[in-house]
Structure formats: C-alpha cells, structure tokens
Amino acid sequence: ICIGMQILFEYSEEDNTQCLGLINGGVKKFQSDSNIKVPQMGWNKVISDTDSLNGYYYFANSYYTDSNDYAIGHSYYGKKFNSIVKKDNFLGCQFHPEKSSDIGEKFIKNFINTI
C-alpha cells in the first residue's frame, strides 16, 4: 500500500533511495504545476483490464511509478502512472484501500482471498 508499492521498484527519487528491486523502474516525484498540486490528496480513478479493480480510490502521494509490464491498473494525475502492480506473488497499490470505502474493502478482501 502506497510507499509499500514503491519500495518494490529499484530506486526512489525521494532521498535518492535504493529500493528492493523486485520490479524494474523507479519512483519519481510529481511536479507541481498549474494543473496539479503535490501531494495528490483525494479520490482518483483506477483503470484496469480487470473490471473488479476499476473505480475511484483514495490517494495520498507525492511520488509515482511509470507504467511497465507489471502494471495491472493505472491512473492519471498530470500524467499516466501505475496505481496497481503485480509480479509473481507481489501485489502493490499506490492508493489507500483502507480509506477507499466499499471499493477499498473489496480490494483488500480479494487480495486476502488470493493468498
């Protein structure tokens, strides 16, 4: 969840930190401009080929990961970014399911039922 997803990648721009390296790529900081405020705080849409994942979730993040082969959900906040990644038995989400009402509860239950 949130930074837990980010540490699955190779590195983070936050304090130039090396991460676990389980997923190729890095974590980058959103750049504030007239269209977006950093951090992203609030509801944003997740788009996935898996219908049960589609919907609005609660985000609180200043950093994002680029799309890659392991993205199973993405969102837009000034640019397209990964909102859900899955590799082998690792699953990460950039949003906070615990703050995402019914859809977040469903996400957590589905995750638990897959392990």
PLM region descriptions:
Residues G26-I115:
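Amide-donor transfer/coupling interface in amidating biosynthetic enzymes
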Residues I1-V38:
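Cysteine-nucleophile active-site neighborhood
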